[in-house]
Design a protein with these regions (language model features):
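Basic, glycine-/proline-tolerant helical and adjacent loop/strand elements
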Residues: 1-3
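Long, low-complexity, charged/polar intrinsically disordered regions in eukaryotic proteins
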Residues: 5-86
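Positively charged, polyanion-binding regions of nucleic-acid-associated proteins
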Residues: 78-98, 130
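Glycine- and acidic
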Residues: 88, 110-112, 151-153
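Eukaryotic modular interaction domains in large regulatory/scaffold proteins
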Residues: 98-100, 110-111
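A short acidic, leucine-rich amphipathic alpha-helix
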Residues: 103-105
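Short, positively charged loop/turn segments that connect secondary-structure elements
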Residues: 109-125
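Charged low-complexity interaction tracts in eukaryotic proteins
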Residues: 123-153
Length: 153
């Protein structure tokens, strides 16, 4: 086995669930609609490996990584959880230990497309960064600069 992972249920938001085509009328379960889970839209912090690249993780490593995801449970609604995970994905895509608010603002168009009813995307980005800071996921370095904390970057 090369890779084996789990994703905590609180990372499942409507945006990652892709509806499949319904079964044909001649199928035993005609009309049944399944789904695919698009794990590419789940932040790396939400992917908890038991086995990674053929190397088995220790129980303590797995439990520690799992406990670091608890902050996602704090999001009250599915919509706020979606925003939180979307902003976290943007931060991970920057791929730098330290990043600026302007770096995250670079994803404004992407976030606007995902959340078309929100006309204050920059304010929402700042709000989510504050939440991530308060939950210990990122550190505020100063003057619009942040540092990723959990994934060892």
């Amino acid at each position: 086995m090369r890779n084996f992972l789990t994703i905590p249920k609180y990372f499942f938001v409507p945006a990652i669930i892709e509806k499949r085509k319904a079964l044909s009328p001649t199928a035993r379960r005609a009309g049944w609609v399944g789904c695919n889970i698009d794990v590419s839209n789940i932040p790396e912090i939400g992917k908890i490996f038991f086995v990674q690249n053929g190397i088995r993780k220790s129980k303590d490593e797995v439990l520690e990584k799992w406990s670091k995801t608890d902050f996602v449970k704090a999001a009250q609604s599915v919509e706020s959880k979606g925003w939180l995970l979307d902003v976290l994905m943007c931060v991970e895509k920057i791929k730098q230990a330290e990043f600026s608010l302007e770096d995250v603002y670079g994803f404004e168009g992407v976030l606007q497309a995902k959340h078309p009813s929100n006309n204050n995307v920059k304010a929402k980005i700042r709000q989510q960064l504050q939440f991530l800071r308060d939950k210990g996921v990122i550190d505020f370095v100063g003057r619009g600069r942040y540092r990723m904390r959990l994934d060892g970057r």
